Amino acid sequence: KKFSLVPGSEMLGRVSGLLPYSGKILIATRYNGLFIYDGETVQKFNSVADSFMQHNRVFCAALNQSLLALGSVQDGVCLLDLEKDEMNVISINSGLQNKTVLSMSFDALNNLWLGLDNGIDCVHLSSPVSSLYGNKPVIGSGYSSIVYQGKLYLASNQGLYTTLPSTELNKEIPMTFVPGTGGQMWSFLNYDGKLFCASDNGVFVIDGDKMEHLDGIKGVRSLVPLNGRPDVLIAGTYGKYSGLHLLKKVAGRWQPAFRLKNFTYAAKSLMAESSGNALWVTNKDRGVCRLILSDDLQEVVSLKKYNHSAFPSGYDIFLTQVNSETVAVSHYGLWRYNQATDSLEEYHELENMLDGKAAYSYLTMDMAHNIWYVSGEALKLLRYDAVKNTYSKLPHDTFLKGSLIENYEHVNVYD
């Protein structure tokens, strides 16, 4: 057999990869970009990745359908969609151990495995979680987020920040600090066309580009509306202000009205029932309580605690709704409210779909009925198939292990 030079290939320089693509051969070069060989001629394949390839010394390449991965010596991996001509760079600021990629391969689950200069990384390309800000601690510790009037608001231990929601994965986006909000921010409520922000310093109300600080209330952890009462909100507070406070809309302005009588506990997790004047409140010491408020909302007229020997207090408990059921997420597993017996019962059905009888610290169901939850110090995902009406877990649906703030986790699926 005799080897012969492919006509026109002199311009390629050093070749980093030969890949089958649409019945032809896609050629990745070290510095000169991409080319296509159709069996007769070599032609330049122009793409948005040309500049990346010219400046970062492409060492290897892999192809998965129309997704081309280019491993570089100087700046990690360039992911190029050959059909859309869109690219994304994954490097140290996206979580790689180092920038030098010497080999790569896609697996059967479409994950990209990288052989680095020192170590091996796996990029979960099908993961629903990606970094907005790289590895940089841009805004300190995060506690909550919400999209309001086209802007993404982020609550942190440093105050309130805002930016535009990003549609590009693993791309750092600029942050703007909201002046006057320095300190611990806890949670948000989009209500009455306004954004209510709960914080150590009380409640901030954002209305478009304007912001107002409500005087007379401090240490606010969360805010909830009451069914059939559009002119009031209940604020759960802690510390020296522990208890429940009522906010009232008067002449178009929201303002603190009074502190409810007969309840002086810290309110870490707060949830209102869809009818009546019933509230669920949790804290570490008191456990889970269901409160009934008076018709004039001046006081708590009934309080029942739901902890018992198999479900003791002493740990933080998170309240959530799963398919219209009230669920307590705890160190002792998942418990749901049985209205017929007025008790919390073990939620074996849901536990069996998740991690069994385990310690859970967070759980939420998104708009597509997927269930996000935290156990074993990691965020996990139970996927819902609307066509089959079934739930399933993928092997790599475990994220951010060891990076979460226990009992203060938050997931906001906004798109």
Label every model-predicted segment.
Residues 1-415:
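Carboxylate-rich, polar loop motifs that coordinate divalent cations or form catalytic acidic clusters
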